[in-house]
Amino acid sequence: MTRMRAVIVTFAVVFASIAADEARTADKMKLAVGQCGNWDSSQIELGTRIGAYARYGVELEALCTQGTGETQQAVIAGSADIGIGVGTLGAIGAFAKGAPIRIVAGSATGNADFWIVKADSPLKGVNDATSAHTVAYSTNGSSTHSVVLGFIRELGLKAKPIATGGPAATLTLAMSGQVDIGWTSPPLGFDLLDEGKIRIFARANDVPSLRGQTVRVNIANAESLKARRDAHVRFMQGFREVIDWMYSDPKALDMYADYRKTSLRNAARMRDEFFAKSALDPDSVKGMDALMVEGVNFKYLAKPLTPEELREFVQVPLR
């Protein structure tokens, strides 16, 4: 009996040691997350809270950024393995210039962002704005930049584009009159709309060419992807799992409302009215041909990428 106990204890120690080793050897991945708090970038925070990535042996260290420019630079420099929510146009332009990045997932197809004016603004719609007015976007090459360029190219907007950073900072600038037409991403701005302090000037999906485009993507540092591909694949397994959970478990909205410091009503309104699950599909990137034409027109690209370059650049789905 004593001998059996000794054997059992020995096995327990061995298994405990193995478990401890596995915990210690979880792959640590650094992420740069654009516009933290947006529904389409919240897979990182929410997934960490429910242990989705840990189940696949991945430990995340996330840094919030103000948008595409900061996110992309962190990945290019190698200070982040993955960038979340990068404007597709900006990513294409950077790759064409030799940046060591690869697209590893779609982040947002279509666009839930909307542009606002103060309630007392004389601007009622796109045709009312002149070259004396300003219109906000986050950073160069971002999805909001693509939208503003689309407003100008396809809807005839004449306002002057100006980079204003994230939605919270932009709302402050719009409410103080420092920019005429601001932008925001739901649920930020819902309360001001309900209180009658702002009006919707235009929606991103008003631009016909953008409705079916993947306007934001997730990118990886090319060297990190090459050296640690298995860890990247396991991260994506967790990422997909989180998206499924966000649309199937009522607790997801409660957790998001807590994370975003908003009401459950606003969280539900945002998801159900602005973000169909298909918009967050990580395993497709749509509209690349049109985006490359846009990139050439606005001088992000000298010429479209070749089919060979696209195959190297877009590694979706990552499995």
Identify the meaning behind each predicted range.
Residues 1-4:
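N-terminal secretory signal peptides that target proteins for export/translocation
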Residues 7-17:
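Bacterial N-terminal signal peptides
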Residues 18-25:
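Sec/Tat signal peptide C-region and signal peptidase I cleavage site
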Residues 26-157, 161-176, 180-186, 197-204, ...:
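Short, glycine-/small- and polar/acidic-enriched structural segments
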Residues 55, 206-211, 276-284:
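Short, solvent-exposed loop/beta-turn-alpha elements that line the ligand-binding surface or hinge
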Residues 89, 168-258:
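Pocket-lining segment of extracytoplasmic ligand-binding domains
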Residues 226-302:
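Secondary-structure end/capping motifs
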Residues 295-319:
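Conserved C-terminal helix/tail region of periplasmic/extracytoplasmic solute-binding proteins
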